Design a protein with these regions (language model features):
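Conserved AMP-binding/adenylate-forming core of the ANL superfamily
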Residues: 10-39, 77-80, 116-119
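Conserved AMP-binding A3 loop
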Residues: 23, 99-126
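Conserved ATP-binding/catalytic segment of the ANL
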Residues: 296-359, 367
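Conserved C-terminal "lid"/linker of ANL adenylate-forming enzymes
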Residues: 349, 382, 397-434
């Protein structure tokens, strides 16, 4: 297995919010006992919560070399059964390099999975330990589900360095979460943009959290103004606010923005993680050498997955990516080698012949109100907000910034912006209500 748990022996590995704690030696024993019940090469399902049993099952699968699909334990039974019918856990034989399968979208309704190896997991965990300078004194609190690649990467990287994981399924909207954080002196917090937007509304900047020394953000682009507020708050509180960028297809992390350059390079996703590298290509596939020129971002590294699976037979496939991932993100590089994501290839629409970046429009609207979300079809962009009497302000801003007529924009007020289980905006649901 990639984690040498016994190496940290009597150190505390996990403190759960039910009061249970395990040393690394105790965790290793539980993992060994569970692993003996599993068959090498035969697919397992792990219905995950942020609890000890889920982590033991996950680690036991790695130990036994039984490939495991990590799924949300709270997902409805019909969806889980649908996936069981497709992938046949307990029966399906898998490729010998396959270790973990994760869903691609933050929802478990789609049968499409990303196929990861132990090498992928280890490479990414080692990179994270290196660039975040993690050690055994860390005490991260779980704010993301472990079936989501970002959440799993936090568990992996901290187990690798002998840290103590504060394990909870409570959310930041619950008082018990904050009590657990304070009582156990959490040293780091992690979230997607929606997390940090909501924490700002909960007056995070006024909270007294002296133990928290690191805050990390990934899973999408955080509004630049909000990012600056967190960067300034971090400086005042002697903390680090670290922006990162990744995809499940790369086992979570591909880049990070060094905390000491966060203010200077605000809006950037930084530089590639230590084990990887980036390049940009144009529409013809030619490598872009110039700075400040948009192209598709390509990532190379040992953390790039083997590919996708959409049926049980796909789990026998070998490595289809060979360490290269076309991210589908449009980006440019500045003169110092820092990368900036400008949008998704699939998040562009044509408005009366003009190419329109929905992600950039969303960021503009966020200067007036958060949360918000934008979707579009040719010749119309629909903006969803949660407050009334702001339609004219939004339209005037977008007319000024884009040069487009007001008829290109529609503003809708809804009760709440739908999000996926991993906290990202659920654009599919928004499209269904248009």
């Amino acid at each position: 297995m990639i984690f040498d748990l016994i190496k940290y022996n009597s150190r505390t590995a996990i403190i759960a919010d039910n009061g249970t704690s395990l040393t690394y030696a105790e965790l290793a024993n539980r993992v060994q006992d569970r692993a003996q019940l599993l068959q090498e090469g035969v697919l397992e399902f792990c219905l995950c919560r942020n609890d000890i049993d889920s982590i033991v099952h996950y680690l036991a699968c790695l130990e036994a070399k039984a490939p495991v699909v990590l799924l949300d334990a709270q997902k409805d039974e019909a969806t889980i059964q649908h996936l069981r019918d497709i992938y046949l856990p307990g029966v399906t034989k898998c490729h010998p390099d396959l270790a973990v399968c994760l869903t691609t979208s933050g929802t478990t309704g789609s049968p499409k999975l990303v196929r990861l190896t132990q090498r992928n997991l280890l490479s990414n965990a080692e990179s994270i330990v290196q660039y975040l300078q993690l050690d055994a004194n860390e005490r991260p609190i779980t704010m993301l589900p472990m079936y989501y690649s970002f959440g799993l990467s936090i568990i992996n990287s901290h187990l690798l360095c002998g840290a103590t994981i504060l394990l909870t399924d409570k959310t930041y909207a619950q008082r018990d979460f904050w009590n657990f954080l304070k009582e156990n002196q959490a040293t780091s917090m992690a979230g997607v943009p929606y997390t940090w937007e909501m924490l700002k509304k909960l007056r995070f900047f006024r909270m007294d959290l002296p133990s928290v020394k690191t805050m990390t953000q990934a899973g999408g682009k955080l509004n630049a103004d909000i990012a600056r507020e967190y960067i300034q708050n971090a400086k005042q509180a002697d903390r680090k606010f670290i922006v990162m960028y990744g995809q499940t297809e790369a086992t979570a992390r591909m880049s990070y923005l060094p905390w000491y350059q966060a203010e200077e390079k605000c809006g950037s996703v930084g530089v590639a993680v230590p084990s990887g590298r980036f390049e940009l290509v144009d529409d013809q596939g030619n490598v872009i050498q110039e700075s400040h020129t948009d192209g598709e971002l390509i990532y190379y590294g040992d953390n790039v997955s083997m590919g996708y699976a959409e049926c049980a037979e796909d789990l026998l496939k070998g490595d289809e990516n060979n360490g290269r991932l076309a991210t589908g993100d449009i980006a440019h590089r500045d003169d110092d080698g820092f990368y900036y994501i400008t949008g998704r290839k699939k998040r562009f629409v044509k408005i009366w012949g003009n190419r329109c970046n929905l992600d950039q429009i969303e960021q503009l609207v966020k200067t007036l109100t958060t949360p918000c979300a934008c979707i579009g079809v040719d010749d119309l962009v629909t903006i969803f907000v949660t407050i009334d009497n702001i339609e004219q302000d939004i339209k005037q801003l977008l007319i000024t910034k884009t040069g487009l007529n007001s008829r290109a924009f529609e503003v809708r007020v809804i009760d709440a912006i739908p999000v996926t289980e991993s906290g990202k905006i659920d654009y599919a649901t928004l499209k269904s209500i248009v």
